[in-house]
Design a protein with these regions (language model features):
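Cysteine-cluster motifs in flexible loop/terminal segments that predominantly coordinate metals
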Residues: 74-117, 122-123
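Mid-domain Rossmann-like dinucleotide-binding core that forms the NAD(H)/NADP(H) cofactor-binding site
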Residues: 123-124, 129-175
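Glycine-rich beta-strand-centered segment in the early N-terminal region that forms part
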Residues: 7-23, 36-86, 129-131
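Short gly/ser/thr-rich secondary-structure transition/capping motifs
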Residues: 1-3, 36-37, 108-109, 145-148
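Cytochrome P450 core scaffold surrounding the K-helix E-X-X-R motif
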Residues: 28-34
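Residue-level marker of beta-strand positions
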Residues: 69-70, 117, 162
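Conserved hydrophobic/aromatic beta-strand scaffold that supports enzyme active sites
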Residues: 3-5, 52-54, 117-119, 125
C-alpha cells in the first residue's frame, strides 16, 4: 500500500470525475491488500468503492448528474435501468476498469475512492441531496446497501419479525 500521485484522464463519454469528501473502508479492500486478487482484479489498483463527493466533470453521455451535484459511489452497477446488478470482480462488461495512470502503468478498479478524486462509470454513481451530511454518507454505497439489503431484499423481513445478526462489523450494524 502506497500513497502517491496518479494522473486521471478526462472523463470518457459515460464517466464521472468525483471530487471526494469521504470514503469508507470496506473489508473486501483489506482482503485485496492481504491476499492475491480474485480473477478480474488487476494490480496496480486504486482501492475503494464507497464514497461521497461532488461531481467535478462528466462525460457527454452522462444525464443523471451534473457538475456540482453531490453523489455517492457504490459497487452496484445501475445497469442503465435503475435495477442494481453487482459488479462482477470489479469489472464492467468483463473489462477491468482502468481509471488512472501511475508510473506509466494503467491503474484499475471500479471507482477508486481512496483518493482525492475518483473517475467512475456513471453506472456506479448515485445522486444524493446536496444538504445531506457528507461525513457519514460514504458507507451508504456498500455497508448500508449490503446490510440493509440483506434484511429487506434477500430475507424480506417484515415489521414485527425478529432476526439474529451475527457479526457487528459495518455490514452487520447496518442490517
Amino acid at each position: 500500500l502506497v500513497v502517491d500521485e496518479v494522473e486521471f484522464p478526462d472523463p470518457g463519454a459515460d464517466q464521472i470525475l468525483v471530487k471526494l469528501f469521504s470514503s469508507g473502508i470496506c473489508h473486501s479492500q483489506i482482503h485485496m491488500m492481504r491476499r492475491s486478487p480474485r480473477p478480474g482484479h488487476r494490480f496496480p489498483a486504486l482501492l475503494g468503492h464507497e464514497a461521497t463527493g461532488i461531481v467535478a466533470a462528466r462525460g457527454h453521455e452522462v444525464k443523471h448528474v451534473k457538475e456540482g451535484d453531490h453523489v455517492i459511489t457504490t459497487w452496484v452497477d445501475r445497469n442503465n435501468s435503475n435495477t442494481p446488478q453487482p459488479l462482477v470482480n470489479h469489472t464492467l462488461n468483463d473489462r477491468p476498469q482502468y481509471v488512472a495512470e501511475w508510473n506509466g502503468k494503467m491503474v484499475s478498479h471500479s471507482a477508486a475512492t481512496w483518493a482525492e478524486y475518483a473517475l467512475a462509470s456513471e453506472r456506479v454513481v448515485v445522486p444524493m441531496p446536496n444538504d445531506v451530511a457528507t461525513d457519514v454518507t460514504a458507507v451508504i454505497g456498500c455497508a448500508v446497501m449490503t446490510g440493509a439489503g440483506a434484511i429487506t431484499n434477500t430475507l424480506q423481513v417484515k415489521s414485527g419479525q425478529s432476526v439474529a445478526v451475527f457479526g457487528a462489523g459495518g455490514i452487520g450494524l447496518c442490517a
